[in-house]
């Protein structure tokens, strides 16, 4: 029986971006199952780019190989922006690669024009997009009627879409490589603390862009439960993030009676809106 052919379209899996890392973890997992014929479609690379040939699955880019067409794209700002998301080669990719499943992982505007393609939904089409703010972008809402398999990265976006009548929208969080996260033996941790002259405090650190999908209230609620259940650990929560967007972190901390002090991070960034919160 033939394996299902899956075309996964996003940033190149070796790029150090959120989409790139997510795609790498997804492709690596699916490849290990041996159940699928995988094809990677990468934005920002030419169709036959040599850089895409060093993975265990097939890889193609979304920019044309022809230098003359590349020049035409370069002088047309709108065309160049759309080309960065794959519009130049997506029809060719579907025709030549003949996927059973198309999975697009990008911001919702990356799929501009895709929903009206003759192949859309004739191939099993899945969109996994980041909706980072409320209210939900109008283009993301209008797209819901044309996307049969619509996945978002954050549950707040799923809830908002369902309030608008789009009950088929579901949440799938970004994929982690769990082999990268593990607890060191107590002896090793003790040696590291001694070597770096660290106090025996329990510090939970989070470096992030302050967006609604980051679930900051859940983190603070969890930390408070942990702190109250383990008062002898001298636990601290270190948040390195932005003040001027997303969650009102200072307000949340005050509501939870967690904040004792906070420090302006003037050393790590020139932005006056960047703060380190040390909660204890």
Q: How would you name each of these model-derived features?
A:
Residues 1-48, 53, 97:
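N-terminal subdomain of nucleotide-sugar transferases
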Residues 8, 198-214, 220-223, 238:
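Conserved donor-binding/catalytic core segment of Leloir-type glycosyltransferases
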Residues 12-14, 207-212, 243-244:
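Short donor-sugar binding/catalytic loops of nucleotide-sugar-dependent glycosyltransferases
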Residues 44, 156, 175:
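Carbohydrate-associated surface elements
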Residues 50-149, 155-159:
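Extended catalytic core of nucleotide-activated donor transferases of GT-like folds
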Residues 172-183:
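Short beta-strand->alpha-helix junction loop in the catalytic core
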Residues 182-198:
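A short helix/loop element that forms part of the nucleotide-sugar donor recognition site in Leloir-type
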Residues 241, 247-280:
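Nucleotide-activated donor-binding/catalytic signature segment of Leloir-type glycosyltransferases, i.e.
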């Amino acid at each position: 029986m033939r394996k299902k052919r899956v075309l996964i379209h996003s940033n190149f899996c070796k790029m150090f971006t959120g989409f790139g890392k997510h795609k790498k973890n997804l492709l690596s997992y699916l490849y290990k199952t041996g159940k699928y014929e995988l094809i990677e479609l990468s934005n920002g690379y030419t169709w036959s780019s040599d850089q895409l040939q060093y993975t265990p699955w097939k890889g193609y880019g979304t920019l044309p190989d022809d230098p003359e067409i590349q020049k035409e794209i370069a002088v047309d700002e709108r065309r160049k922006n759309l080309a960065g998301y794959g519009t130049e080669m997506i029809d060719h990719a579907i025709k030549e690669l003949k996927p059973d499943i198309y999975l697009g992982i990008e911001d919702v505007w990356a799929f501009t024009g895709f929903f009206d393609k003759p192949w859309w939904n004739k191939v099993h089409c899945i969109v996994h997009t980041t909706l980072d703010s409320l209210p939900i972008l109008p283009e993301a809402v209008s797209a819901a009627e044309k996307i049969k398999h619509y996945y978002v990265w954050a549950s707040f976006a799923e809830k908002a879409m369902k309030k608008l009548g789009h009950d088929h929208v579901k949440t799938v969080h970004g994929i982690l490589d769990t082999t990268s996260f593990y607890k060191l033996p107590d002896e090793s941790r003790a040696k590291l603390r001694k070597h770096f002259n660290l106090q025996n405090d329990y510090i939970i650190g989070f470096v992030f862009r302050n967006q609604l999908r980051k679930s900051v209230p859940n983190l603070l609620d969890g930390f408070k439960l942990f702190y109250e259940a383990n008062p002898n650990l001298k636990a601290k929560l270190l948040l390195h993030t932005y003040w001027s967007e997303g969650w009102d972190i200072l307000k949340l901390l005050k509501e939870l009676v967690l904040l004792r002090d906070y420090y302006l991070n003037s050393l790590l960034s020139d932005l006056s809106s960047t703060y380190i919160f040390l909660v204890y």
